[in-house]
Amino acid sequence: MTDLFAQYQGVETHLVVLEIIGVFFGFLSVWFAKKGNIWVYPTGIISTILFVYLLWHYVLWGDMLINAYYTAMSIYGWVLWAKNAHNNVITISRTTSRDWYICAGLGLFSLTFVTTVYYLKPFIQNNFSMEGIALGFEHFLPTEYVDVFTTAIFLVGMWLMAKRKIENWIFWIVGDFISVPLYLKKGMLFTSFQYLLFTIIAIMGYIEWKRHLRNTPAPLQK
């Protein structure tokens, strides 16, 4: 345990505090999502904005971009859910064939875009100059390959959540589970623990939403 917290040696205190706050609001957001409660979005926005800053500081661009996307999609989802909510609780449905085509397009876009960002990473870090650098996939770190994959998973999951589709939980479960060791490897212990909790809550959320669909067409109860 001491070795785990040793990852924070030399890290500025305010960064650790911001990570803890971001984790707390992220936990609240996922819990509200499980309950089908519209408060998933305001709490999520606080968390994602904090993580955009933190991930920019740690030069984890793929993660930073997906959190920026989360922020924008949370605003979109907030508006969308507000139009279809009763007492802050929304109705849910299953993903249609058309939805799956959109998911495939979003996933492909994400894979292409984030791969391009990491491919150009040496160029970007060199103040957008090609002098003395070379581009290539051989420069990719193992965590960056995983980051490309999880970013696509989360992007699709976030869109499905905004559309109130039960299948969003499947993407969250897979992405959250992969992120546990990923963030531990990146030296962000609290964030790794957050994703462990997210995995558990996502499983609970899927079970609860599935039970709702099976038993009644009425909105989820708080």
Regions found by a protein language model. Name each.
Residues M1-G36, N84-N88, I92-K222:
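Polytopic alpha-helical membrane-helix bundles and their juxtamembrane interface segments
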Residues G44-T95:
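Hydrophobic/aromatic-rich structural module bridging two neighboring secondary-structure elements via a short loop
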Residues P42, I46, A68, V174-F177, ...:
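Hydrophobic residues within alpha-helical transmembrane segments
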Residues F27-L55:
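Long, highly hydrophobic alpha-helical transmembrane signal-anchor segments
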